[in-house]
């Protein structure tokens, strides 16, 4: 099956699955945030909280058989995995060769899309600089970049993994307007990873962005935003990471993002991908299992109210019967 086939079938019952990113427990960008938390604890607590899947994190095995064994042990599927793209700085052939091992891992584990963020011109610097200092594409660069990204997405689709482009603070595609521009200069094989929190943090309107690009959305990151921290971050020109440490993000239903409207729009337009709770916080301040449970409970309730039906995996009450794992 090729990556352009709908993730769970546009004409099937409105059944979706909920996953979580391990960033709730451990932040790969900031080792002091959960760096000593073992992978086994992350996965066990994901399942205890009710999740059907996980995205990749830095502690996960990168060999297909080993990763499958550990995910099977906890009854989890692989929803996707982040890739630090460099397409702005590379040609398509070089970028595809660089990402191929990652795509292979995702395909082997059944993930339908890769989380692709273009971190050219220094994402890791960008997320630590004031938000006003992040990299930008010049006006004349958009068309050429769109052609390159479309070519890359077509190569990925032929391989069997779709491209889900992640708009992200501190990168060349950050704001709602830049997402609009990107969608206008790329072909349909370029799917959109819709991230409610990054839209809000950038000064956008997550509901309106979701409505405008619903037919291109193939993967969803569900993060909420604390309004007081958002205002302080934008007024004070904080860096992305400083805002995270101040608590800008939280799980769905615990902030100011209008998730009922977002989910209703996704249901209306036939979305069948994953809903991923991906809300980085300081685990010393926001107890991971507590927030994981809160996020799943809130998102499941709001998704059901919007017309989605949770898969049996999310409804399953998992009991950890392992010994000394």
UniProtKB/Swiss-Prot annotation:
InterPro entries (alphabetical): IolE/MocC, IolE/XylAMocC-like, Xyl_isomerase-like_sf, Xyl_isomerase-like_TIM-brl
Family named by the database record: Belongs to the IolE/MocC family.
Entry function: Involved in rhizopine (L-3-O-methyl-scyllo-inosamine) catabolism.
Protein name as catalogued: Rhizopine catabolism protein MocC
Species this chain originates from: Rhizobium meliloti
The encoding gene: mocC
